[in-house]
Amino acid sequence: MIEKYQLRVLPQQVFSEQAVIDFLAKDKGIDARTVTHVRILKRSIDARQRTIFINLKIRVYINEPPQDNEYIRTVYPYVGDKPQVIVVGEGPAGLFASLKLIELGFRPVVLERGKDVHERKKDLSLITKIQKVDSESNYCFGEGGAGAFSDGKLYTRSKKRGLTDKILNVFCQHGASTSILADVHPHI
């Protein structure tokens, strides 16, 4: 049986599956021995009062193994011999446009006037040290776009539209921690 629950736990309980199961058993009256797996679907911090709590939305597997993957894996087709499409810019929009083109069976050719991230670091240090700006390689132009040197915090005001879940799945498929799927404000 698969059930969904919402729990309000202390921070020290959230990172141990057994602690979550024990809390669930006590709070919801479930026999902890029957819980085979707990998957955290959403996690947020409630720091409005003196005691900080973590709000969890969880999927609980009772007497059965988990049936789903943590994230959806996209299988990209081979497009080496397909028609080319030019994508301008290697920022987030260009990279996701390229992935979508591959899904649709096209071969993207990405054009970027800036440098790769490692070379951009050198150019950015020149901006701060001697105020020398390279018009082709700076905070805005180059691999990763303007977000390459951000703090990694992604915010969206949209909860009901857009492809937020798909984008987070793509990040996980390419090496991001699966915790970003559960965190309300993921740090990527």
Where in the sequence are the language-model features?
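Flexible loop/turn segments at secondary-structure boundaries
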Residues: 117-118, 188
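N-terminal Rossmann-like FAD-binding beta1-loop-alpha1 element of flavoenzymes
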Residues: 82-117
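Extreme N-terminal leader/targeting segments of oxidoreductases
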Residues: 2-83
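Charged, amphipathic alpha-helical segments characteristic of ABC-type P-loop ATPases involved
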Residues: 118, 124-125
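Conserved N-terminal/central alpha/beta ligand/cofactor-binding core
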Residues: 6-9, 20, 125-188
